[in-house]
Amino acid sequence: MGGTFDPVHNGHLVAASEVAALFDLDEVVFVPSGQPWQKIHRKVSAAEDRYLMTFLATAGNPQFTVSRIEIDRGGATYTIDTLRDLRAARPDDELFFITGADALAQIFTWRDHRELFELAHFVGVNRPGYHLALDAGLPTGAVSLLEVPALAISSSDIRERVGRRAPIWYLTPDGVVRYIAKRRLYQGAS
């Protein structure tokens, strides 16, 4: 599951759990982006903070792991590089790339987007208020769309709530709430 995870929240966790159950996945690997190329004009929390928050959020589920693959690579991070690396490391595994349907709608702007569908099956998770149709020019058979239980939670909403000192309990796991407070993340985000 790829994303900025700034911060990771319960919507991400529910989506990962639902996709794992639907596709009978052995493992869901969360891959926090290193330096997301599409967010160079937006302030993004340090990669190490996003990695640690994702680790805290997923630690209780033995089916979830967190990879540093993009963080340790350095420089701008591209999904194609990550999928190539994962394919090389796991040549016999069937790879599924889980992302938000809103991100999937932009996939034709991603580097080497045609090759992406050869490396993994893409699963787009529709969030409340956003719906992507499979007829959006996406390759047949290479993409699945999934509706998950309605959790109207977004990372940007959490950052904004922290910035105005509103509670974020129950929107993201307790360990992430404490980590955000301890590191004083998102203080100026309102």
UniProtKB/Swiss-Prot annotation:
Family: Belongs to the NadD family.
Organism: Frankia casuarinae (strain DSM 45818 / CECT 9043 / HFP020203 / CcI3)
Protein name: Probable nicotinate-nucleotide adenylyltransferase
Pathway assigned to this chain's UniProt record: Cofactor biosynthesis; NAD(+) biosynthesis; deamido-NAD(+) from nicotinate D-ribonucleotide: step 1/1
GO molecular function: ATP binding; nicotinate-nucleotide adenylyltransferase activity
GO BP term, example: NAD biosynthetic process
Reactions accelerated catalytically: nicotinate beta-D-ribonucleotide + ATP + H(+) = deamido-NAD(+) + diphosphate
Annotated keywords: ATP-binding, NAD, Nucleotide-binding, Nucleotidyltransferase, Pyridine nucleotide biosynthesis, Transferase
InterPro entries given in the database record: Cyt_trans-like (IPR004821), NadD/NMNAT (IPR005248), Rossmann-like_a/b/a_fold (IPR014729)
SUPFAM superfamilies in alphabetical order: Nucleotidylyl transferase
Keyword Nucleotide-binding: yes
CDD domains: NMNAT (cd02165)
Cited function: Catalyzes the reversible adenylation of nicotinate mononucleotide (NaMN) to nicotinic acid adenine dinucleotide (NaAD).
Class in the EC hierarchy, top level: transferase
EC code: 2.7.7.18
Entry-linked Pfam families: CTP_transf_like
